[in-house]
Design a protein with these regions (language model features):
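P-loop NTPase Walker
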Residues: 1-43, 497
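Accessory C-terminal helicase-associated subdomains
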Residues: 346-453, 457, 473
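Coupling/switch/interface segments within P-loop NTPase motor domains and analogous charged loops
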Residues: 45-110, 356-406
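Conserved short internal alpha-helix adjacent to the catalytic or cofactor-binding core
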Residues: 296-297, 306-340
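Conserved RecA-like helicase ATPase core segment
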Residues: 42, 154-155, 159-242, 529
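C-terminal accessory regions
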Residues: 374-377, 441, 467-534
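Helicase P-loop NTPase motor core
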Residues: 202-205, 211-299
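Accessory N-terminal region flanking or inserted into the helicase ATPase core
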Residues: 64-145, 154-159, 184, 192
Length: 534
């Protein structure tokens, strides 16, 4: 994930190791774009004449449009189940609604677009159609280190393997934890040493770490209940003998829960715990939207790192998301990062939208242009209006008009529509300060999902919505042979192992199925016998 990549960058920075021309840190999708697709796209006809990456909002809009065109009258949840992926030879994988997937990909190709999942496929095809490309890239790599390898997909392994096969001198390392393999539903695979060796033609040594420098021993003992492959974990941090606080409440109502969480946060902050050491998480986003707004109102003196429940959805591959970062952050802060983002924007304009900015116009020029236009804004206290104002002037200054570049305007409209939908549907503030808050440094209380929290650690973790149907999800309960038990075990392991000292778990009462049945607590959690604090 992007957040895990940022975490690695921060840890390198603490060691006085900044990512420069010799070190690159990022997601596999970012790697595929920067190292394979952008420089070598001419080798694959599907993207050789340019391409734009659509986001999931645009994807849903396309599928909904096709649904109407075919008069299928499928509901949203039915549309979401349609497999839009392609095989390695660009064939449709969907079985039941093949025409939907076919029309979707025809639409993408006509528009010179690819979706997020196609990034991997396109990169792999480029490496296979021209062996010189793989050799060229591999010859410039000394080492490849893969974190969270248990969540790596088959196609991701294949991309990495192509490079390793073309340079036996590359040092490679795969690090992960089988108990944290929470992306199985997204085809994540934890390959064995033997499988890796066969795939990459490299030899690996297998090693296991038994020490934990994060959680106290009591917490370790608690979340060891959720191990898939039991082995003893020893707490070795300075807090190893601390008792901490572990509670589980399955009787509180969803109406009373926000106030309880507010009081927990107040108590922890008053006891000296930093805001950045507190995390509130849920299995899915939607309970966090209203909870986040409530906490911001009730705790106005607190800062929140709640980018996942903000007006703009995080999308590090999006031109318009990157522009938003520059619009809503201060010009004199983190100049190096702002220059990198500005450079990314210029690259995307060229590679995805075919917009050739003049050679002498560099990242600093873009930053100066944005800063000057921002100072011109005198409209209402509205983040969307500010965004539109600055973007309009940027386009004019760069000679980007709708007649010559219709694609960028189409995607700009999709972006604005999604922002306005998120504000309306989740009752979010549209003030400029609300937009700025989402891009502030991660020093506040974190609100995020169980999947996004992986790789991070906090003194205090507050987990809500631990209910059957959420963990495990209904899709796993109905469609997986073990009814989602394995998935639930791993997700609970990830949630609980984020905490250093304090863990508050809630299976709140008041959620119902579409048939009106009350959702009950996640069974794996409900069955555990433990000496809770409450």
């Amino acid at each position: 994930t992007n957040r895990a990549a940022e975490e690695i960058k921060e840890r390198l920075s603490l060691l006085s190791i900044d990512d420069d021309i010799n070190i690159w840190v990022g997601t596999i999708h970012q790697f595929c774009l920067e190292f394979i697709i952008y420089p070598f796209k001419m080798n694959l006809s599907r993207v050789s004449k340019g391409f734009t990456i659509i986001d999931d909002y645009t994807q849903r809009a396309y599928v909904s449009q096709i649904n109407n065109m075919l008069n299928l009258n499928l509901k949203t949840y039915e549309l979401n189940k349609i497999d839009l992926s392609l095989s390695h030879d660009f064939k449709i994988n969907e079985v039941q609604y093949t025409q939907v997937s076919e029309m979707y990909h025809t639409m993408l190709e006509k528009n010179k677009e690819i979706d997020f999942d196609m990034i991997l496929l396109v990169a792999y095809k480029i490496l296979t159609v021209n062996s010189n490309v793989a050799r060229n890239i591999a010859s410039n790599i000394r080492a490849i280190y893969v974190d969270e390898f248990q969540d790596t997909r088959e196609l991701q392994y294949n991309v990495i393997a192509k490079l390793l096969q073309n340079n036996p001198q590359i040092q490679s390392m795969f690090v992960g934890d089988i108990d944290q393999a929470i992306y199985g539903s997204l085809d994540g695979i934890a390959k064995s040493v033997e499988e890796l060796e066969m795939l990459t033609s490299h030899t690996f040594q297998s090693k296991t770490l038994h020490g934990c420098y994060r959680s106290n021993q009591r917490l370790v003992d608690f979340y060891s209940n959720f191990q898939s492959c039991p082995y003893e974990i020893e707490s070795r941090g300075n807090n190893k003998n601390d008792r901490g606080f572990i509670s589980y409440d399955c009787k509180v109502t969803k109406e009373d829960l926000p106030n309880i969480i507010k009081n927990i946060i107040k108590e922890k902050i008053e006891s000296g715990i930093h805001e950045k050491d507190i995390c509130v998480l849920a299995p899915q986003h939607y309970p966090l939207f209203s909870l986040g707004e409530y906490l911001k109102k009730e705790l106005p003196y607190c800062n929140f790192d709640a980018i996942n429940i903000s007006p703009i959805k995080v999308n590090n591959h999006s031109l318009f998301f990157k522009l938003a970062i520059l619009y809503f952050t201060e010009s004199g802060e983190k100049v190096r990062r702002r220059k990198l983002i500005a450079n990314d924007i210029l690259i995307i304009l060229k590679n995805e939208f075919g917009i050739e900015v003049k050679d002498y116009f560099i990242d600093l020029d873009l930053l100066q242009l944005i800063n000057s236009v921002k100072r011109m804004y005198s409209g209402d206290d509205n983040g969307v209006d500010l965004y539109k104002f600055v973007t309009k002037h940027i386009f004019v200054n760069l000679n980007i008009d709708e007649k010559n570049y219709p694609s960028i305007f189409k995607h700009y409209l999709f972006f604005i529509n999604e922002v306005e939908d998120r504000i309306k549907n989740n009752s979010l503030s549209s003030s400029v300060s609300s937009f700025k808050k989402m891009f502030k440094s991660r020093d506040g209380i974190t609100l995020t999902t169980a999947h996004k929290v992986k790789g991070n650690e906090y003194d205090t973790v507050i987990a809500i919505n631990l209910l059957n149907g959420k963990i495990p999800h209904w899709n796993e309960i109905f469609n997986v042979s073990d009814k989602g038990i394995s998935s639930a075990r791993k997700l609970l392991y990830v949630i609980c192992s984020r905490a250093k000292n304090n863990l508050f778990l809630f299976s709140e009462v008041g959620y119902f199925t579409s048939k009106g049945d009350l959702l009950y607590p996640t069974q794996l959690l409900d069955k555990i016998e433990f000496d809770y604090n409450i």
